[in-house]
C-alpha cells in the first residue's frame, strides 16, 4: 500500500480492503504522417495480425475497426491480467453505439510474420468512429481506493460518504481525492467510472466482471457528450485468457 496523503491517513485501515491496482494510460494523439509500430500499444492504427489470419468483420461482412491494441509486454503487471501477448478490441464502424458488434482477440505469441496490407480499411470507414486519430500509448502503475459509481465501492469515512468528505476538502486535496477515488481516464483494471450508472449492478451474472479496458473522452476522443467506453470480462475468463465473452458498455452525460 502506497503512502496515503495526510488527510486520508486516519482512514487507512478502512481503505485497505478497497485497494485495487490499475495501469493508467497516457494516450498521445499522433501528428500527421506519424504511425506506431505494428505490435505497439495504440488506439486506432494498424493491428498486429499473423499472416493468413482472418480480419474481424461484422455480421454483414463489413470490417470492424481496431479501437485499441494492448501489448502487455509494455504494461505494468496486474494480477490476473496477461504478462505478455497482445489484446485487441475491434468494434463496428457505424453501429458502435449499440455495443453489440465487437470482437476481442488475444495473441499469446507475436513472433509470427504480420500482415501489412489492409486495403479495405478506407478513410470513410472511420467517419463515425469516436476515436478521431491514432494514439501512441504509455502506461503507469496506479493504486485506487474506490470509484464513486462502481458497484463494488461502498467505502465510508468515519460515517461520511465519499461525497460528504469531498465537500470538506481544500482544492488541492480534492485533486488528490479524484485520482484515488473517481476512476476517470483511460486505464486497464481498477475501478470504473460512469457518467450514469454501473451496468454490472443490474444482473447477478455480471457481479464477477472486471474492467479489461476503459477509454475516456479526451482531446481527440469523444463518446457522445463526454462519455466513457468500457470493456468488461469475467474474472475467471481473464485468468484463463478466454476473451470470447468480453462485452462493451458506454454512457455519457
Describe the role of every protein-language-model region.
Residues 1-253:
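Preference for intrinsically disordered or flexible, low-complexity segments
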